[in-house]
Swiss-Prot record:
Presence of the UniProt keyword Translocase in the record: no
Any one cellular-component term (Gene Ontology): cytoplasm
InterPro entries: G-protein_beta_WD-40_rep (IPR020472), Histone-bd_RBBP4-like_N (IPR022052), WD40/YVTN_repeat-like_dom_sf (IPR015943), WD40_repeat_CS (IPR019775), WD40_repeat_dom_sf (IPR036322), WD40_rpt (IPR001680), WD_repeat_RBAP46/RBAP48/MSI1 (IPR050459)
Family: Belongs to the WD repeat RBAP46/RBAP48/MSI1 family.
Protein name as catalogued: Histone acetyltransferase type B subunit 2
Alphabetical keyword list: Chromatin regulator, Cytoplasm, Nucleus, Repeat, WD repeat
One GO biological process term: chromatin organization
Function summary: Regulatory subunit of the histone acetylase B (HAT-B) complex. The complex acetylates histone H4 which is required for telomeric silencing.
WD repeat coordinates: 156-196, 203-243, 247-287, 291-331, 348-384
Originating organism: Encephalitozoon cuniculi (strain GB-M1) (Microsporidian parasite)
Superkingdom field: Eukaryota
Localization (cell): Cytoplasm; Nucleus
PROSITE patterns named in the record: WD_REPEATS_1, WD_REPEATS_2, WD_REPEATS_REGION
Subunit structure: Component of the HAT-B complex.
Length: 384
């Protein structure tokens, strides 16, 4: 039996064990097979209640990655949560929840990342393998349009990539990064269909894999990339405030400012670690979180708890971390299960976890997507 067959057998066995234990591990678990993989997932902020039907409806922003097999789309889905779950419907995990794609917007190339503008959620930015960032206003597009018609094209990058970050404090400002090594900042509030960057930031000598604006300082931007370097920028003066040359021992794939603490930054890397930094003292990380066995693709802070963050990996796992537990004593019999700050391990995916998003309306609930077309919405047990 070759290694690939053996690995798949192990994955299948692990999944069977996980599925059997779902009722004991989760407050909520919903799994849905998409037509194509989505490399991107993000909860919209709106929540609609139907008291009569006893249901809550939320929306998710997704995309397609068909590898050239079909047209590519941005997808907007609605998810209906019943107040009470009917156990008899739970042959499929989360059987009485419903997910429906309510809008498809044709795009030029398969999306690496799609993010809505927090100041105007109808405005969506798409980062792909094309150099330009395309912006769509979903109120101006009919579903099933066959020809991609971006409302704005943001020019300035020399190559495609993954990094996209809207500025929560400066409406219409968007940063992007990619394989070309530059970080570009755009103002999409301009009345133009073709927009050049207001700022181009250069310090990285190789690919920049992610960028993120601060939630507390509108001119503070972070970027991270190949070679393990993190850079903090002042976008107004265009200065590099600080560079951590070797924040990780391998390429950094994700960087995020905490939405609840203006001094804290998280990074994740191909070295299998997540690190948490205080920007006032960047010589050493505050925390090094070890629990993944492969590349850590994404890291996202909880919007509800300043000590909690989650990470997704090519090891098929999502781990929720609680920094408040760092350094706590662990009984000998539990040490093999992971460090004290590992709050929860989600083992429902059987392929690389591409992206994760915390539900802003529901504490400890996460949407995660994987390379094998699976979208999962899950809620770990609530703390007492």
């Amino acid at each position: 039996m070759d290694n690939q067959v053996l690995e798949q057998k192990i994955v299948n066995e692990e999944y069977k064990i996980w599925k059997k234990n779902v009722p004991y591990l989760y407050d909520l678990m919903f799994s849905h097979t998409l037509e194509w993989p989505s490399l991107s997932v993000q909860w919209f902020p709106d929540v609609r209640r139907d008291e009569e039907a006893g249901r809550t409806t939320q929306r998710l922003l997704l995309s397609t990655h068909t590898s050239g097999s079909e047209e590519e789309y941005i997808l907007i889905a609605k998810v209906e949560f019943p107040d009470e779950f009917d156990e008899s419907l739970n042959e499929e995990v989360g059987g009485d929840m419903r997910l429906k794609i309510i809008q498809r917007i044709s795009i030029m190339d398969e999306a690496n990342r799609v993010r809505y503008n927090p100041s105007a959620c109808n405005v969506l930015a798409v980062r792909s393998d094309l150099p330009d960032i395309h912006v769509y206003d979903y109120t101006k597009h009919l579903s099933h349009e066959k020809i991609p018609r971006p409302d704005m094209v943001l020019r300035g990058h020399s190559a495609g990539g993954f990094g996209l970050s809207w500025n929560h404090l400066n409406p219409g400002e968007l940063a992007g990064c990619g394989e070309g090594g530059e970080v570009c900042v755009f103002d999409v509030s301009q009345e133009s269909s073709s927009i050049s960057p207001t700022v181009v930031l250069r310090r990285h000598e190789t690919a920049v894999n992610d960028c993120a604006f601060s939630f507390f300082d509108k001119k503070l931007l972070s970027s991270a990339g190949d070679g393990g370097m993190v850079v903090l920028w002042d976008t107004r003066s265009e200065d590099c405030i600080h560079a951590i040359e070797e924040a990780h021992t391998s390429d950094i794939l994700s960087v995020r400012f905490s939405p609840l603490d203006g001094n804290v930054i998280a990074t994740s890397s191909c070295d299998g670690s997540v690190k948490v930094w205080d920007r006032r003292s960047l010589s050493q990380p505050l925390h090094i979180l070890l629990g993944h066995s492969k590349d850590v693709v994404s890291v996202e802070w909880s919007p509800h708890n300043d000590k909690v963050l989650a990470s997704g990996s090519t090891d098929r796992r999502v781990i929720v971390w609680d920094l408040g537990q760092a350094g706590a004593e662990v009984p000998e019999e539990y040490k093999a299960e992971g460090p004290p700050e590992m709050k929860f391990l989600h083992g429902g995916h059987t392929s690389t976890v591409c992206d994760i998003s915390w539900n802003p309306a529901e504490p400890f609930e996460i949407a995660s997507v994987s390379e094998d077309n699976i979208l999962q919405i899950w809620q770990m047990p609530q703390p007492e």
